[in-house]
Amino acid sequence: MGEIKKKFVQWLEKLLIRLKEPNVKEESLFEDLSPSNDVDTDGKYSKALSWGLENKKVKNIALTGPYGSGKSSILNTFQKQYSREYSFLNISLATFNTDTDDMENKLEKSILQQMIYRVHDRTIPFSRFKRIKHIRTKSIIINLIFFFAFIIVGIYLFKPDALKGIYAETLVSRSLGTEDQQQIRLTILLALFFIVYPLLAYKRIYHFVRANLKLNKVTIANTTLEKNTGEENSSIFDKYLDEILYFFEASKYNVVIFEDLDRFNNIGIFERLRELNELINNSEQIDRRVVFIYAIKDDIFGDADTEKLTRDRTKFFDFIIPVIPIINASNSGDILKKKIKHSPYSDLINTHFLEDVTIYIDDMRVLKNIFNEFVIYQQKLSAIDLDPNKMLAMIIYKNIYPVDFSKLQYNKGLVYEIFQKKQLIIEEQIKLINAKIQQLERKLANIEVESLKSIAELNFIYLSELEISNLNSNYDINIDGEVFRGNTSNKDRFFEKLKNADTIYCYLRNRNGPATIKEIATVFGRKPNYFEREDAIKAIEKNEIQKFKKELLELEREKQEIRAQSLQVLITKMNSKDVFSDKLYEKKLLVYLLRHGYIDEMYNHYITYFYPESLSLSDIKFVFSIKNHESLPYSFELDNIGKIMSKLVGAEFKQIEVLNFHLLNYIMDHSEYRNYYDSIIERLANGSKESVTFIDGFKERAINKAAFIQSISSKWDDFWSFIELRSNYTQQKKEEYLSDILTYADIADIIRMNKESVMSFTLSKYLNLLSLVSDEEKIKELLLKLQVKFKSLDHLLNSETIYDFVVQRNLYEINIKTLSVILNDAPNITYAAVKNSDQQAVINYVNDNIDIFVEKVLLTEEIEEPEESFLELLNREDLDKRVKHAMIMKKTFAISDIGELIKELWPIVIRENKMVACWSNVITSYVEYNKKMPDFLIAFLNNPVNRKELSKNNIEAFDDKFDEAILEDISEEIINSRDITDETFEVLIASIQSWIYFPLGNVSEKRAKLLIDNDLLSLTPENFKELKLNFDTLHIQLALRNPDEFIDKQGDFSLDANDIKQLIDSNELSQFNKEIFVQHLNSNCLTDGNNDILKDTIYFINEHNLKITNELLTFLLESPTTLDTRLSLLAGQIKHIDNESITEFLTKIGEPYSEIAEKGRRIKISNNRTNKALVTALESKNYISSFKEDRERLRVNTKKK
């Protein structure tokens, strides 16, 4: 009972509310899309149409104009005004499929159907077109009553007795036998009904049979009559022409209006309609004129202005009425503005937007529909705070590009694709920024590891590695035709040339042939890239480290801005064609809407219904970003975070998209969301760039910074490692983080962060540590547990407690700065100074860490360590060999006595020229290495400074310290060593021994000559023979170096004809010595001589009138020289020999000269200068009696018997 009462009360309340509501009909904003009937305000079009219809000659009228120009509205207006004067038949072919086959027949069929089915079947009862008829129940009942009445009347009229049994006691039966006039009239009426009803039934049956029965074939006996079926291939109009004529005969239509025929671009249908019009108007059975009116576009007969187009238009139509468009691109904006002005949205729509966008709209129906749909969408989605301009833009897009709009609902189409492409473009821009970030990070990494201080130092190292820095190097590198080697002056331009090289050829120790820039810059992969190191050094010189770090921060911010960038901004910044596809770029309206942001990333809200409850648009966008995994800027504003929380689930708080400054502050302020807070902290502790960027931004916005830093520190062990090593933050920002961590993080968490001692290292170098944290006890605990080693102690002097704690616990590095403070600002922190100090703790600390002391103190500055303590350090077994090598290479010193240094260091000491250049050290090293010259010792000797110093003393001066044999061995090694350069040998030759005999088989000609020139080879037969054996002329030079000695011992040397010739031809041998030499020649020396040498020897003898031995004379007279040469020699020697010898020599010469030796003879010989000299000498010697000179002969008279 109570439930019924409750419902009754509710019903009454609703009734009262309805009664209170004013019964005012709200004026609708909507407007139908059908043609208007009140557009012809001035009546011009109606008058023109009326004139055409009244003109008997006009049967086809064209109303022409573009789509949307108002043709249908004009016709509607005309029909409204002249509905009594004319009967209008409207035929519209508003189909959108214009590509079907057999188009003309389909059009004719559609026209015929619209005619036939336009009128009631009663109007054209004889039409063969079937149609479904609805028979009402009332009609069925009436027909049945008439049928049964007909039966009863028939029985009554023709067999009344049959009814007596049924109606014996009825009122009817009592009236049958009466003669009452009324009864008679009733009978007559019934008889008439009996006659009329069958006639009416027959008429109906006839109509049915005629309309539905089709006789195609009749067979009688063996004969078949078949109807002609050729009409099946004829057109629809031809096939049903009788139906059309019957239609107009039976109906009253005299004006037929055709619309939308021009959609099909089919000229044939106009031809068929014109023919049909002629048939209708010429038909005798149709007693009226029928006019066809066509609403068509101007270019229906062609899209090019030709004479044929003009003729076709005027041929087809009897009267053409042009229509001036009601709307076009220039006035559509005014029309739409007018509509909006009279709506509740007049103040919400931007006028400039309307003016711009309506340029693309030139159809009134489209314009009306845009407004209608805008009103519906705006009312339906009014619960969400949407931009009306964007709403209108979306509706315009929906109407102008309906197919793409439909695709957008299913994440397809051009609009969807461009927003997808936007993400790809953003990712490409992010990639470019990441590349810049990587480049800067690589630069910073190179700067951190770079140890060199200048480009000159870098050039020297790389050129040395390439082996083209040494002046004596034979290696070179050819860059674009320019050769670079050790002895050229263009080495300073090497790397500048290399940077832009096209072709590179190298000729090096281990590489010959072409090379690449990278190969040369990295010394064939053995060293870091030269140009990267060059950039690093330049950056260090310009102090650009902080600049690079600031650039990194700016790039990270730019990444965040780009990720939040709208498509509108993207289009503005980029070339439109790079954003829009070619297909989309053709759709200018859509491009406009996208370019100006009227269709943006929030388009989903404008095309789908969303139940927002109390969520704002930004809240919805944020929720969607999480659901769709599309990140928004971390600072994105949120309005109702409580409602947002209700829309999210636990797993979503682990997504990167959930990161938002306002959201996290809200969660931190509400303890009930602790689980969500932990999920976000775990997400932030993964070390990703997104997480770190968020932490950096939120740190200063957090409502509880201490709790946030403590949470991050507890979850992220690499927190400080990332900040210090990988973040590339500026120094100031790093200090801010360090202060926050030391202040808010737990000690256990800080210790856990100290991976690879990063935190310890950081604290050790901070000079303002005490200003970062005020809690001294916490500092002490951290310093001890982290084993911090301070790089400097100056800043700790302000706190005596901390300073003493650090010194007592050895929490400082051994370096110049710390030891200088501890040792009271000592000027030079040498090992000797440490040993001589009174601070045993420092001495012990240094000795326990001697390697560190040497590296961080001795090797960092040019401190002169006394030789005694320096040798002590080098000889220490606990000092690392690597450190010793570094000492030798970096420190300036010279070992006076190499023997006092441990042997293993000799090679590097000698190689680095850290040994005093004296023969004692050289010989000691030579003896130590088994009387061999190791390469480092040879390099020491080749050093210009060293060889000059050694040349000041002769090696023989050390015979009291070393055996004579050792001195000879090292001298011989110096002479024979090919590794000792000729330049060095020229200098050292003054210090080595001289040799009575030295084997020269391994000595170069140049060095042999130097030995001769420096008188280190004595003139001995052994040295003479050794030189002659190994060289062409040096034995002669040795002889000429000592001419007097050579002439004195001429017989001790093995000479040949060539030697004799060289000596005779030499300008260095005096004429006197030459004469003595020739006079004492042994004939054996000339046995291997050729005729030229023998002839030259004879010539020299004759020229200088020398007396030679009979032995030599005999040899020369028997030599194969010319007779003239031998006769001239004999002629010159006759005065030096006796007659007996003359006789012997003349006999050796042969006839006719041998006959001169016979007495009592008269001999004839040729008269020439040689013969004349001979007989003259013989006559002077009184060897012949006389001679007489004829013209051609000389007559010689010998002595009488």
UniProtKB/Swiss-Prot annotation:
GO terms for cellular component: plasma membrane. SUPFAM superfamilies: P-loop containing nucleoside triphosphate hydrolases. The keyword Membrane applies. InterPro entries: P-loop_NTPase, YobI-NTPase. It is a single-pass membrane protein. It holds the Pfam family YobI-ATPase. Keywords: Cell membrane, Coiled coil, Membrane, Transmembrane, Transmembrane helix. Residues 420-459, 536-574 form a coiled coil. It is found in: Cell membrane. The chain crosses the membrane at residues 140-160. This is Uncharacterized membrane protein YobI.
